[in-house]
From Swiss-Prot:
Protein name: Large ribosomal subunit protein uL2
Entry GO CC: large ribosomal subunit
Organism of this sequence: Sorangium cellulosum (strain So ce56) (Polyangium cellulosum (strain So ce56))
GO molecular function: rRNA binding; structural constituent of ribosome; transferase activity
Positions of region (Disordered): 29-54, 212-258
GO biological process: cytoplasmic translation
Gene behind the chain: rplB
Job description of the protein: One of the primary rRNA binding proteins. Required for association of the 30S and 50S subunits to form the 70S ribosome, for tRNA binding and peptide bond formation. It has been suggested to have peptidyltransferase activity; this is somewhat controversial. Makes several contacts with the 16S rRNA in the 70S ribosome.
Amino acid sequence: MGIRSFKPTSPARRYYSVSDFKEITKVEPERSLLEQQTSTGGRNNNGRITSRFRGGGHKQRYRIIDFRRDKIGVPAKVATIEYDPNRTARIALLHYVDGEKRYILAPDGLAVGATLLASRNADIKPGNSLTLRFIPPGTSIHNVEVKKGKGGQLVRSAGVAAQLMAKDGDYAQVRLPSGEIRKVHLDCRATIGQVSNSEHANISLGKAGRSRWLGRRPHNRGVTMNPVDHPMGGGEGRTSGGRHPCSPWGQLSKGLKTRNNKRTDGMIVRRRGTKG
């Protein structure tokens, strides 16, 4: 796993870098685990833009990923390590002894031919899945469930890992990559290890076109718009009109708390960005 850079034959090529994809062992995905995926262009069912600056991009097929890891006690062998256009991490194809095939997020260091297991008796090694109850404190984990049986929702991006800090009663304290420490029930599952493709953060797109390939359209600042389009638009030169920076709908963008989920506030032991 490394990064390729290129001779500066053009201004874009000067800062252009890509993964060397050396860990990839197969080009064509498993057909039985593919689904058609249609692009929304950031529009909802009414055709209105709900997510700005989205659209275009290369056509992709969705790989069905097993985030639940619910084949308990059934060993599986790693058949391939593959590229997934829908996420930053690599994925691994598992062949279970009962004949079933499933994709999982590939942890860092996973090799073809390794045997993985989802069980309370599984070894503490990358790729194995256990409930937090049977994972020792200090272990690096990813693909962490928030609700028992729902499947992993936390810590799934390339190169990230959470750390199991401590256990208290029915809950474990997990330190997330953001620095937040959160309580998660001991019956929730997690996978051992760090997510693969840790060099992803060091890749430079190099040119605007690569953003377009990913379905990202140009992002325009509010201060450059007309007053009809944004509260901070208009004026001769750059001027905010005297108001604080805000979104197109008037919501303050500097320091305003937007989280509105009191039901799970008690699960946050320490918020991200706090010292001590």
